[in-house]
Structures are given as C-alpha cells and as structure tokens.
Curated annotation (Swiss-Prot):
Keywords: Ribonucleoprotein, Ribosomal protein. GO terms for molecular function: structural constituent of ribosome. InterPro entries: Ribosomal_bS16, Ribosomal_bS16_CS, Ribosomal_bS16_dom_sf. This is Small ribosomal subunit protein bS16. The lineage of its organism: Bacteria, Pseudomonadati, Pseudomonadota, Alphaproteobacteria, Rickettsiales. GO terms for biological process: translation. Belongs to the bacterial ribosomal protein bS16 family. One of its GO terms (cellular component) is cytoplasm. Residues 92-111 are annotated as: Disordered. NCBIfam families: S16.
Length: 111
C-alpha cells in the first residue's frame, strides 16, 4: 500500500481550510485517511504562526515508514525543520527542473 502525506480540503466555498493527512495514495482527496498530522489555513497572514501547524514527531514517523509527501506538503515540512529523506529531495529537484514556465495570457492571445 503506497502512503502519501497530502492536503485534504475542508472549509466553505471561497474559504478553504486544509488538513495535512496521511492517506492511501488511491483514496479520494477528501476521503478516508490514516492520520491527521497537521493543518494549513491559507486565509491567515503569511507571518501567522497558526497558518501551518504540523505534528513533527508523527511526520518523522510516517516518513520513516516510507510515506511520500506531495510537493506542497514537502515544502511545509522543510519549513518546519524536519529533514526529508534524500530520495524525496531528489524527486523534488527533478520535478522542479522538468517544470516549464506557463505561457502568459498575452502570449496565448497572440498565437
């Protein structure tokens, strides 16, 4: 069973709130999960300490068992001071290199 650490959306329309959860990779985005390991509230100010709240000890446990974080969650984990496994770091670097800049809307209209 492949396990991911990812965001599950909650909140109301135009007022998102996310739970950071550990879930089976095939489970629906907002569906069943194994454990809630944090929260993310994008509506709070960037400098607010409650914008991203993580249970570091549980995240370290799940990373140790082989759970893979999504890109966004991996950024949150690094900012919280938890070291990611080398394999995950390499995957993030490869994705960053392969990511292409999207053309601007002006370029789309001109073409």
């Amino acid at each position: 069973m492949a396990v991911k650490i990812r965001l599950a959306r909650g909140g109301a329309k135009k007022r998102p709130f996310y739970r950071v959860v550990v879930a089976n990779a095939t489970a629906p985005r907002d569906g069943d999960f194994l454990e809630k390991v944090g929260t993310y509230d994008p509506m709070l100010a960037l400098d607010n300490s409650e914008r991203v709240v993580l249970k570091k000890d549980r995240i370290e446990y799940w990373l140790g068992t082989g759970a893979k974080p999504t890109e966004r969650v991996a950024k949150f984990i690094e900012q919280a001071g938890v070291t990611l496994p080398e394999k995950v770091k390499k995957e993030m670097e490869v994705k960053a290199k392969n990511r292409k800049a999207r053309p601007s809307k002006k370029e789309d209209k001109e073409a």
